[in-house]
Amino acid sequence: MMVGVVFGLHRLFFCLYVYFYAYIIYNKSVKGSEFMNQLEQIVEISAAGNGVLRTSEVISKGISKTTLAKFVEKYNYERISHGIYCSPDVWKDGLYLLQLRCPKTIFSHDTALFLLDMTDQEPLQYTVTVKSGYNATHLREDGVKVFSIKKDFFELGISKAKTPFGNEVFIYNPERTVCDMIRSRSQIEIQIFQDAMKQYIRRKDKNLHLLMEYAKKLRVNHMLSKYLEVLL
């Protein structure tokens, strides 16, 4: 009788052992499969972002920070700033990365001219415009030229353009950029300023009505009229 009970208990414990062992193996297999699937997802996100990963975007796909950290370490991604990583296999797009780091900036003035094909000169430093009151100390420390404007005019003429690397960034449209150049003419090289005005007049998509509308709002309409009299 006792032998039967012992044998029964032994068999029960053996079955439980096999069950839990199988359960652990299954879990590891499933988790391993899920982990690989998540890595593949991160690769796809990186490819779609031209080699750039944002933590917020990865997490929004249901991928954990731990998995992202392992991916970044495994594939030697460089940390550009908090929550932004760049693949070692791509050229770093400074314009795109700057706006990812500082999304409250708009590329303006000579940087906008460059992206709008209104100058042949690649800017020596990036130029952005921010709302008045924005703390731009970190930008200036990074060598970025910063202009500020009242919030009422900050969004006037916002547009999009592609960087030389094909990434999309926010800039001001040609009409707003011309007005900005006039407003800040004392801080702009005269040759760049004159060439920009000539390039604008040559544009097939120029909108003189919109230009004058912006000029009135930004209070440069009288100065603009003088330049247009010479150029038109």
Where are these regions (language model features)?
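Targeting/processing segments of secretory and organellar proteins
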Residues: 3-5, 10
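Short, positively charged and aromatic/hydrophobic N-terminal segments
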Residues: 13, 17-28, 32
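A detector for short, charged/polar N-terminal pre-domain segments
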Residues: 30-35, 39-48
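Nucleic-acid-binding surface
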Residues: 38-41, 51-57, 80, 84-232
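Residues in the helix-turn-helix
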Residues: 67
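Basic amphipathic alpha-helical segments that dock to polyanions
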Residues: 70-75
